[in-house]
Amino acid sequence: MESALLLPSLLLVAAYPRGGSPQQEWMQSPPAPSVTSAPFWVRLNPELEAVPPGGSAWLNCSHNCPLPVHSSLRTQLRQGKIVNGSGWVSYQLLDVRAWNSKVRCVVTCAGETREATARITAYKRPRSVILEPPVLVGHKYTLRCYVTHVFPVGFLVVSLRRGGRVIYHESLERFTGSDLANVTLTYVMRAGLNDLWQPLTCHARLNLDGLVVRSSSAPVMLTVLALSPASIALASTSIATLVGILLAVGAVYVRKYLAVQT
Ligand SMILES: *[C@@H]1O[C@H](CO)[C@@H](O)[C@H](O)[C@H]1NC(C)=O
Ligand SMILES: *[C@@H]1O[C@H](CO)[C@@H](O)[C@H](O)[C@H]1NC(C)=O
Ligand SMILES: *[C@@H]1O[C@H](CO)[C@@H](O)[C@H](O)[C@H]1NC(C)=O
C-alpha cells in the first residue's frame, strides 16, 4: 500500500529534479516518456572517497541502459584495473596524491550521453598532536605544540585553547607542499592568576571542502608552582608576545608511510 503510494512522488522527483511544486506539475503535465521506458541515468559510487596520500580507490559507474553502451572514465588520476558486469563498470584509480581529484564517468546509450561525477580526496590525519608542558622563562610561558605526519598541510588549522576558549589559531594555507609534514607551533604568553588550573589544549583541524578531520592533544595545566610572584603582579589576561610556526616536510616519510600501508 505504502510503497504504491510513494512510487509516483519518487518518480516525479527524478523527472523534475529542480524547481516548482512537483504535485502541481504532475497535475498539469504528466512526464513525457512513457511509463515503460525509464529515463536514462548514470551513477558513480561512492560520490566522495577518502584515501591516504598515494593510496588507491575503486569507483563503480552504473547505468540503466538496456543496450550495450560506451562508457569511459575521465580523470587525471592514473587508472588501474577495470571490472565490469551487466550495467556497471568498476574502475581502480591509483596513486592518489592530490588532496582533491575529480572523476567523471561518461556513458552513451542509444545516442544519448550522460555523466556522473565523484571526488577522491587524499588526506592523512595527524599521527599525533602533542602539547608540551609550558616552560617558564622569565615571566612568560612558552607553549609548544607538535602536529606530526599530517597531509595536506595547506588545509590545516592549529589552535590553542585555554579552558576551552581559543587563545590562538593559525592557518597553514600558505604551505602548499604535497608531502606529509610535521608542524610545530610555538606560542609565548604571560599568565595571571586566572590562568591557574585552566587546561591548555592544542587542536589540529583539516578542512577538506566539507570533510572535517579533527585531532587534539591531551590537556596540560599551568600550576601554582610554575607561577612566579612577579607574574601574578602582571596583567591577568594573557598576551601573546611571540608566535611561530615551524614546518618540517619529509618526502621520505610519504614513502615510509605508504610502505606501512601496503
Ligand atoms: C557496481 O554497482 C552495481 C550496481 O549498483 C552492483 O550491482 C555491482 O555489484 C557493483 N560492483 C562492484 C564491483 O562493486
Ligand atoms: C565487460 O566488458 C567486456 C569488454 O568491453 C565486454 O565484452 C563484456 O560483455 C562486458 N561484460 C558485461 C557483463 O557487460
Ligand atoms: C616528524 O616527526 C616524527 C615523530 O616525531 C619524526 O620521527 C620525523 O623525523 C619527523 N619528520 C620530519 C620530516 O621532520
UniProtKB/Swiss-Prot annotation:
Entry keywords, A to Z: Cell adhesion, Cell membrane, Disulfide bond, Glycoprotein, Immunoglobulin domain, Membrane, Repeat, Secreted, Signal, Transmembrane, Transmembrane helix
Biological-process GO terms, alphabetical: cell-cell adhesion
GO MF assignments: integrin binding
Extracellular side: 23-231
Any single GO CC term annotated in Swiss-Prot or TrEMBL for this entry: plasma membrane
Signal peptide from the UniProt entry: 1-22
Domain Ig-like C2-type: 54-116, 138-209
Sugar-modified residues: 60, 84, 182
Cytoplasmic side stretches: 253-262
TM segment ranges: 232-252
Described purpose of this protein according to its UniProt entry: Adhesion molecule that binds to leukocyte adhesion LFA-1 protein LFA-1 (integrin alpha-L/beta-2). ICAM4 is also a ligand for alpha-4/beta-1 and alpha-V integrins. Isoform 2 may modulate binding of membrane-associated ICAM4.
Full protein name: Intercellular adhesion molecule 4
Native species: Mus musculus
Name of the gene encoding the protein in the UniProt record: Icam4
